Amino acid sequence: MVEYIKYTPELSGNWSRAWSETQKQRPWQSRRLLDSATTSQLQGKLWLVNELNKLDLKFSNVCLVGGWFAQLITPLLFDNFNINFIHNWDIDPDAKQISYKFNRRYKHQNKYVAITSNIFEKSWSKFRDSNYDLIINTSCEHMYPMKKLKELNPDLKAW
């Protein structure tokens, strides 16, 4: 059972730098940054990883839908599964830049990409052409029902 994020010196360095840079470069995001690191945010991500472990399935290409800053879920997925790549889709352009700060080591290893896009636009061809074997939406309460995504992308392989 996964009960914590492996808080390594590398992760600590990434996160402290990310917090500092965000405070300087995007001070208007300070409140949201704090909201992204609450106890309930971490508990939800830990629960998700434990539920995925119970499935005993192999995932290599992950899509985070509305992944926000993805600073909690990304290391949990990489540390607990044999993940090759994570795409983080979010409609907020600030989320992309901030997520790159928190996940810079994965970005530099070409294992992480953040994309600013509305997943419910019909022209979302990058999504349809991707080879995801796991799609995670931890923001569905802020979106249209996910069946709308399937209607717009009938050829999704990971459905």
Describe the residue ranges of each PLM region.
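Conserved SAM/SAH-binding beta-strand->alpha-helix loop
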Residues: D90-D94
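Short beta-strand element of Class I
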Residues: I83-W89
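Conserved class I S-adenosyl-L-methionine
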Residues: L57-A70
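S-adenosyl-L-methionine
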Residues: M1-K58, K96-L134, T138
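Conserved SAM-binding loop of SAM-dependent methyltransferases across substrates and taxa
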Residues: F69-N82
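A short, conserved alpha-helix within the catalytic core of class I
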Residues: S139-D155
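Conserved acidic residues
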Residues: S60, S130-D133, D155
